Amino acid sequence: MASAASVSSLADEVNCPICQGTLREPVTIDCGHNFCCVCLTRYLEIPCLDPGELPTCPLCKEPFRPGSFRPNWQLASVVENIERLKLGSQLGSEEEEDVCLEHREKVYYFCEDDEMQLCVVCREAWEHRHHTVRFLEDAAGPYREQIQKCLECLRKEGEEIQRIQLRENQRIQVLLTQVATKKQKVISEFAHLSQFLEEQQSVLLAQLERLDGDILKHRDEFDVLVAGEICRFNTLIEELEEKNQRPARDLLTDIRSTLIRCETRRCRKPEAVSPELGQRIRDFPQQALPLRREMKTFLEKLCFELDYEPAHISLDPQTSHPKLLLSEDNQQARFSYKWQNSPDNPQRFDRATCVLAHSGFTEGRHTWVVSVDLAHGGSCTVGVVSQDIRRKGELRMRPEEGVWAVRLAWGFVSALGSFPTRLALEEHPRQVRVSIDYEVGWVTFVNAVTQEPIYTFTASFTQKVFPFFGLWGRGSKFSLSS
């Protein structure tokens, strides 16, 4: 069988001088040169001749009569035999993929309007004549850039899902540790009680065991989900990297659907701890409420000492708005319309009538109680804020600004989320217990008298947070206790 090189050399001898492709239905003109019938016909249609002037040969420029060209059947037979040799030598190779399926010509161009790869014959077709047509490599450049951007986005998404996995696994570990700690303390406390309390012990332990199992189950489901997401992203990245290394024709094949897949593929950002599971964990202390009459002291210990460390906090005079009057021990604050002669230091609130605690938290579980005494029309805001909270000018109290708080107003209570939400409570609280779990990211508010849950924020703390208090209304005041 003839070698591929010799066949290719022979094929070059029977190329059309106009389209540079293999002769199709070859015709001969007066000078003896041969052309594709279609190419020569289109050449004669070009309106570039003066009236009465004969067209010239595209190769030697000799004039010829337009109607004098005749089919060259012998040359057509030679071309057909060369084509057979050419196809035989390319059998099993990838060269065949570079051939236009319609005209059997090699593709050189890419139509950006129709997103089609064109041979020289396709390029001259009327449907592409007024389109933007570029060489394959030139057309591939912008698409390579788009793929590169998609790869960068996918890699960032992959890194983000890995960060989520690490963060959520850390939260799971903290919750498992908390559950284990609660379990041991529940056992030790119930060991000193009567048979009546032993029944309660069994109930609580069973709930904790279910929570333990549910947390582990959620962890396994979360790990499977994250592993699947990572696998899908890695597969897509590998596919794009492999496609980006292909020749321009392969890269441009079905390029639009590939880009759409990249642009529409976004990672899910799952949470390892569902709101329902988190609510069950937070509500665990409330399961002991039936014991309130028999052992109020034990109930308080079960509700908070099993979960949180009492925080002995005091107000920071350096942050207090000039309209807030602090007690000498910095445990109480009262609103006054009279401005105090306070230095305007960077830490002080100058517009929002607020004050921070002297000390903040970077870890652990802490709780404190705020007793509120509101005058008519007054309000008190309690919660925690991030260390870099805005002190000067207007303060927007919402989680996006680093504020996790509830507002007790005359007749209603609101959770200050992205949009303030009025809460339906059985009793308007006069004492609010604020609890923070730094590692898990919970800020919980409970009626300190009735133990009725008020609200819980979920956050991801990255810096120091401080207990936060706001007060409004002449005569309104609050005091602190652990």
Curated annotation (Swiss-Prot):
Interacts with IFNAR1; this interaction prevents association of IFNAR1 with TYK2. It comes from Sus scrofa (Pig). A zinc finger (B box-type) spans 95-136. Keywords: Cytoplasm, Metal-binding, Zinc, Zinc-finger. PROSITE patterns: B302_SPRY, ZF_BBOX, ZF_RING_1, ZF_RING_2. This is Tripartite motif-containing protein 10. One of its GO terms (molecular function) is zinc ion binding. E3 ligase that plays an essential role in the differentiation and survival of terminal erythroid cells. May directly bind to PTEN and promote its ubiquitination, resulting in its proteasomal degradation and activation of hypertrophic signaling. In addition, plays a role in immune response regulation by repressing the phosphorylation of STAT1 and STAT2 in the interferon/JAK/STAT signaling pathway independent of its E3 ligase activity. Mechanistically, interacts with the intracellular domain of IFNAR1 and thereby inhibits the association of TYK2 and IFNAR1. The gene is TRIM10.
